Amino acid sequence: MKASTGHWADEAAAKIVFEKGEKEQYTCASGITPSGTVHIGNFREIISVELVVRALRDMGKNVRFIYSWDDYDVFRKVPANMPKQDELEKHLRFPITMVPDPWERDANYARHHEVDVEKVLPKVGINPEFIYQAERYRSSRYAQGIRRALEKRDVLKNILDKFRDEEHKIQGEWQPVSVFCEKCNKDETEIDGWDGDWGLSYHCSACGCQEKLDMRKAKGVKLVWRIDWPMRWEYEKVDFEPAGKDHHSHGGSFDTARHVCKEVYDYDAPVSFRYDFIGTKGLPGKMSSSSGNVITIEDVLKVYTPEVARFLFAGTRPNTEFTISFDLDVIKIYEDYDKTERIAWKIETAKDETIFQKEKRIYELSQVSSDGKTPSLEGKQPPYQVPFRHLCNLIQIADGDIEKTLADLAAVDNGPNKEQLAVLRSRALCAKYWVENCAPDEFRFRLLPSGGAAALSQEERAKLRSLSDVEKNAVRILRDDVICKI
C-alpha cells in the first residue's frame, strides 16, 4: 500500500521507512501506566499505532507491534472511582504491581486494569505483543541500561537542564535512578552512592533500611521516567512511537528523551507524531456514574460496533481533537460510516478518484482483523445496510426483541443472508443499548396492543391533538416507512 491514498497512517508508514531505511523488521511501540481505569483517551494512542502498523504491513513490511505496561511505576494516588479507598491508600508509594486488587479478581491492582484492556482489544482487531515492565526490571534485564545512565549522569543532567529555567535546574548531587526499598517496598528512598561498577547504596526514610545493592541481581532499581523511556527505545529498537501533545510540547518528555536516546544510548529516537485529546458528550447517567466519568473502550463498544469505533479514529488525524458522542449524534456517525462503506464498495459514486481512494482506505482500516493485516474486499459481498435510525425504530416496534427484528429483516425480499445477519446483530445490539440507555426521551416509543387507542389517558389524547402538522407528518412517515413494511 502506497501513501498515495492520502491517509495519515500511510503517510506515517512511508515516513518511517524513509527515515529508518529498509529493515528486516520495524518495531512500533505504545504503552501506558495501569494506575487506574484505562480510558478512551488512552485508547487513541494504541489504535493510532495499530493503524500505522497495518499501513506498514500493507507495504509488505515485517512489523513487531509492542505494548508496554508500565506496571513498575509508583502508585502515587488513589483514583476517585476505585473501591476500597482506605485499603488502597495503605499502598501508596508501592510499585503498582504490589498493590492488591480491590475487586479481588486478579493478582494485583495493575494486573486488573491490564486484563480489562487485554480482553477488549481483540474485539477491535488489536493484538499487540504485551511487555510488562515490572517483570523486565525485577529480572534485571535493564541492568546494563541503568549502569549506562549512571556513567553518563553528567550528560543527562545537562540535557534535562537545557529545557529548564534557572529556578528549576537540578541542584546538588543527582542520580538518574530510584529504588523501591528491599524491606518495605516503598520508593521513599535516597541514593547514597554508586561504586562505579554494579553496586548502588541507598537508605529508606520510610522504614530506616540501609542497603547496598548489586544492580545485576536487585529487583527494586528503576530509571526515572525521562531516562527510562529512551533507554527502552534503544533496548527494543523502536522505530515508531507517538505521544500525547503534553509529551510533545517544547521541553516535554519527548524532547528530552530524543536527546538522551542519541547522546547516552547512541540510538536515533523513533519517528513520532502528536495525538490530541478526546472529548465525550451525551453520556447517560448510568455510564458516567459507574466509572467515575471515566469512559472506556468497553463503554464505547456498547454504542458503536467495533468497525464504527475504529472508523472514528481511522477517519480523524491523530493531531485533531474530536468528540465521541452518545447522544443523537450517534445516528449521524453511523450515517457517515454507511456512506463511506457504500463508496468503498462502489455502491455510491464518489465525487472524484481522490475522494474514492480516501474513503476506501478509511473503510479498509476500519475493518476488524485478527491477523494484524488490513482485510481485503476482494471476492467478498457488501454488508446489508440498515440505517441505525431505522434499526432503532424496528427494535422498538419489536419491543426490544433483537432476534425478532433480525428475523423480520431476513424475511423481506432480497433480505440479508446468514453472514450479513451476523454483522447486523452487532449493530442491533448497539441500537438496543443506545435506545434504552442513551437516546433522548422523545426518540423512544412503544406500540400499544390492538385496541390500545381506547386506553389513552385524557392527557395523552390532548398531546396527540396538540401535535403540529410537522409532527403529525412525522408520525405518518413512521407508520408508512417503518411499521407498514414489517
Q: For each predicted feature, which ranges?
A:
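N-terminal catalytic cores of NTP/NDP-binding nucleotidyl/phosphoryl-transfer enzymes
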Residues: 1-83, 230-251
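Hydrophobic/aromatic-lined pockets within catalytic cores
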Residues: 57, 122, 150-157, 161, ...
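A glycine-rich helix N-cap at a beta->alpha junction
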Residues: 86-124
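Basic, alpha-helical terminal appendages of large translation-related enzymes
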Residues: 1-23, 38, 64-65, 157, ...
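Charged, often glycine-rich, active-site loop that binds/positions anionic groups
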Residues: 72-89, 145-146, 285
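Active-site cores that bind ATP or allylic diphosphates and position pyrophosphate for catalysis
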Residues: 126-298, 453-455, 460-469, 476-480, ...
